């Protein structure tokens, strides 16, 4: 046997052994035999580096120091899930599904508490792994994901596919990692999720390989070739992916709830952390029929487990002003450990929330983390509230008190008493600019409407530079606050006039950081226009809405001149967003700001736009069967270039099916529905 054949044999053998060990949990060889074969392969590859295969198991052992992580733009939108916290909320979601789908069936899966990622395979080989990021743009973490031993570098079939899943750190590995960190004098990780996220952002791949991350894959992001979610998961197992076996088929709310109760009981016994249950409509065609909101699919929901709670005391309440002028109360509390992190502050939302719960200073309260993330005050422990005291105070000479008759002097030694009042003082003036606060009838928030309020301007600048908006690395809240205080910037357009010399006048900003910030500002000019639109901070316009708006109007200038009626025609966007967008661009200064940003060289075009004037413009097309000339990704790109929306399943909304060889149930269903059928050659002839 020649060397190339031997390397091929060893690579295939070791990959099969790894599949049996990590995926099937049925090892067929002893560790010693695996190690012997592995070291034999390492030696042969070192002597013959030109023969190393892309799926070699030696890629998993680390040894690469990365310079950083580059951005990766996902070809498919990676939506987050809506969530519910009770059976009643779940019932409302299920009721909405039943209004659209007759006798829906569901798949219930455990919600893994880890880091979401996407894996891209071409011809069966792993070519890219990326974090979800904001659902549109993530980070390329391919080298690190290759060090996760249960991620197949080569699939059982030579196909193109994009899959979504969760990377997590098993509890046993988490305990081992923290024990090692304590011995080294390093701070322990707060929880396995933080450890998993931190591990995947390591620049040294040896550290990733050592920590023992694992994965569960659960969704095909590229157009699916199966008819149900259940079939997708079974297909993933056949391809070599790790799929969570803890799942249940359900036909109604009662059966869904049975699985949730079972998952709740199992939660502490599992070798990994979960934070809920994901419920999905099983039929993929029905998923497509239900569609999406701006942020999430209508065909799936996440039930979140009741949050862990802790008792603490409210010490005081701060009021802060956000970028839209909303004044938000935050409780300062006695620090307490909650969900494995120390919490000393919690949001109180708004005045109504404080008054409804009768929250007072020095109250004992129960706090929890909504979705295990944001600390919130849940319940006031009224039985532990101390009765109000009478305070006695002696005023010295030359002091004054206010009475309804005006100010009067207090003689030395005069004593008076008053009743202690621990109720939270509701502000009537903005804590930043002293303008009168307004409480609009249709809102629960207190709002500062002064457009020159320094807090609002500062927060708008911070939002503009943030990761989900223009992503200007290095330009964080501290730097922006200093720039604003020194009057070096007064609006977002001023950021594009900054120089290294300007930045060097700030505290803790040295030459290297200043150069990095100026470079990041310059790079942000090339961002797609939906990032800029989101960065402008228009009320009700989040990242998803910004993308939908720019997909429709293609250019920020065109959007700025659109009417409410035109915007309201966009699916998933309502009148509230339309009114907010039109109102923003009608305000004094909006046109001037756009002119300044355009003159500064910012991109106003939506970079994801396709030619929508093609012969398939607005048509929904499904690919099915085996293509002999085109790769599936090439066929999809060709269809999209012709204006088509490529879907993964056949429904009444499908306009056309392109059927290759061995097309199965999708072709049959299309024929039953009378949908137009094309061959691969028909597509090639265009």
Swiss-Prot record:
InterPro entries, sorted: BRCT_dom, BRCT_dom_sf, DisA/LigA_HHH, DNA_ligase, DNA_ligase_AS, DNAligase_adenylation, DNAligase_N, NA-bd_OB-fold
Annotated Gene3D superfamilies: 5' to 3' exonuclease, C-terminal subdomain, 6.20.10.30, BRCT domain, DNA ligase/mRNA capping enzyme, Helix hairpin bin, Nucleic acid-binding proteins
List of residues binding NAD(+): 31-35, 80-81, 109, 132, 166, 280, 304
Record's GO cellular component terms: cytosol
UniProt keyword terms in alphabetical order: DNA damage, DNA repair, DNA replication, Ligase, Magnesium, Manganese, Metal-binding, NAD, Zinc
Domain BRCT: 611-686
Cofactor: Mg(2+); Mn(2+)
Binding site for Zn(2+): 430, 433, 448, 453
Catalytic-site annotation from UniProt: 111
MF-aspect GO terms: DNA ligase (NAD+) activity; metal ion binding
Reaction catalysis annotation: NAD(+) + (deoxyribonucleotide)n-3'-hydroxyl + 5'-phospho-(deoxyribonucleotide)m = (deoxyribonucleotide)n+m + AMP + beta-nicotinamide D-nucleotide
The keyword Zinc appears for this protein: yes
Superkingdom of the organism of origin: Bacteria
EC number: 6.5.1.2
Pfam family membership, one: DNA_ligase_ZBD
Enzyme superclass (EC): ligase
Biological processes per GO annotation: DNA repair; DNA replication
Stated family: Belongs to the NAD-dependent DNA ligase family. LigA subfamily.
Biological role stated in the UniProt entry: DNA ligase that catalyzes the formation of phosphodiester linkages between 5'-phosphoryl and 3'-hydroxyl groups in double-stranded DNA using NAD as a coenzyme and as the energy source for the reaction. It is essential for DNA replication and repair of damaged DNA.
Protein name per UniProt: DNA ligase
Natural source organism: Lactococcus lactis subsp. cremoris (strain MG1363)
Gene that encodes the chain: ligA
């Amino acid at each position: 046997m020649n060397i190339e054949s031997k390397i091929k044999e060893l690579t295939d053998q070791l990959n099969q052994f790894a599949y049996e060990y990590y995926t099937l949990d049925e090892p067929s060889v002893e560790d010693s035999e695996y190690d012997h074969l592995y070291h034999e392969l390492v030696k042969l590859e070192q002597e013959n580096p030109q023969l190393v295969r892309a799926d070699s198991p030696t890629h998993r052992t680390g040894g690469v120091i990365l310079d950083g992580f580059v951005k990766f733009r996902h070809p498919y939108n990676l939506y987050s899930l809506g969530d519910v916290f009770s059976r009643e909320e779940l019932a409302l979601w299920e009721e909405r599904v039943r209004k659209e789908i007759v006798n829906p069936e569901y798949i219930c899966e455990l919600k893994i508490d880890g880091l979401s990622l996407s894996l891209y395979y071409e011809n069966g080989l792993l070519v890219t792994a990326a974090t979800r990021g904001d659902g549109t743009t993530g980070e390329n973490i391919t080298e690190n994901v290759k060090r996760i031993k249960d991620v197949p570098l080569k699939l059982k079939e030579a196909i193109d596919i994009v899959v979504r899943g969760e990377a997590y750190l098993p509890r046993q590995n988490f305990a081992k990692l923290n024990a090692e960190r304590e011995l080294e004098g390093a701070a322990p990780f707060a929880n396995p999720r933080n450890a998993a996220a931190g591990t995947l952002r390591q620049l040294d791949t040896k550290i990733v390989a050592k920590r023992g991350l694992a994965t569960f894959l659960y969704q095909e992001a590229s157009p699916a070739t199966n008819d149900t979610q259940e079939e997708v998961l079974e297909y993933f197992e056949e391809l070599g992916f790790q799929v969570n076996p803890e799942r249940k088929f359900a036909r109604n709310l009662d059966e869904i709830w049975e699985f949730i109760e079972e998952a709740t009981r199992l939660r502490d016994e599992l070798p990994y952390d979960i934070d809920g249950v994901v419920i999905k409509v099983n039929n993929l065609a029905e998923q497509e029929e239900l569609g999406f909101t701006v942020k999430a699919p209508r065909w799936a929901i996440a039930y979140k487990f009741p949050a862990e709670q802790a008792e603490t005391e409210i010490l005081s309440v701060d009021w802060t002003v956000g970028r839209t002028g909303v004044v938000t109360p935050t409780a300062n509390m006695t620090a307490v450990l909650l969900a494995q992190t120390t919490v000393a502050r919690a949001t109180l939302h708004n005045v109504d929330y404080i008054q409804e719960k009768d929250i007072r200073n020095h109250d004992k309260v129960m706090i929890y983390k909504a979705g295990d993330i944001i600390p919130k005050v849940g319940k006031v422990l009224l039985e532990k509230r101390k009765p109000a005291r009478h305070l006695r105070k002696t005023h010295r000479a030359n002091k004054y008190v206010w009475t309804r008759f005006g100010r009067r002097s207090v003689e030395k030694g005069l004593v008076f008493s008053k009743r202690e009042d621990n109720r939270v003082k509701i502000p009537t003036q903005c804590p930043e600019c002293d303008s009168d606060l307004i409480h609009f009838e249709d809102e629960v928030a207190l709002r500062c409407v002064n457009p020159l309020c320094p807090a609002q301007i500062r927060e708008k600048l911070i939002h503009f530079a943030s990761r989900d908006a223009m992503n200007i690395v290095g330009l964080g809240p501290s730097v922006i606050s200093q720039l604003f205080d020194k009057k070096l910037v007064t609006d977002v357009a001023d950021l594009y006039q900054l120089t290294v010399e300007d930045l060097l006048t700030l505290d803790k900003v040295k030459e290297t950081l200043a150069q990095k910030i100026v470079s990041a500002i310059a790079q942000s000019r090339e961002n797609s226009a939906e990032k800029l639109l989101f960065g402008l901070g228009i009320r009700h316009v989040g990242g998803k809405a910004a993308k939908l708006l720019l997909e429709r109007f293609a250019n920020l200038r065109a959007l700025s001149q659109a009417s409410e009626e035109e915007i309201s025609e966009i699916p998933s966007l309502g009148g509230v967003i339309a009114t907010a967008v039109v109102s923003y661009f009608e305000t004094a200064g909006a046109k001037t700001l756009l002119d300044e940003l355009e003159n500064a060289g910012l991109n106003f075009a939506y970079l994801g736009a396709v030619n929508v004037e093609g012969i398939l413009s607005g048509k929904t097309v499904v690919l099915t069967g085996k293509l002999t000339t085109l790769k599936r990704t090439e066929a999809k790109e060709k269809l999209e270039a012709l204006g088509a929306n490529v879907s993964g399943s056949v429904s009444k909304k499908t306009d056309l099916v392109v059927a290759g060889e061995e097309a199965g149930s999708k072709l049959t269903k299309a024929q039953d529905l009378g949908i137009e059928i094309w061959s691969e050659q028909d597509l090639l002839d265009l």
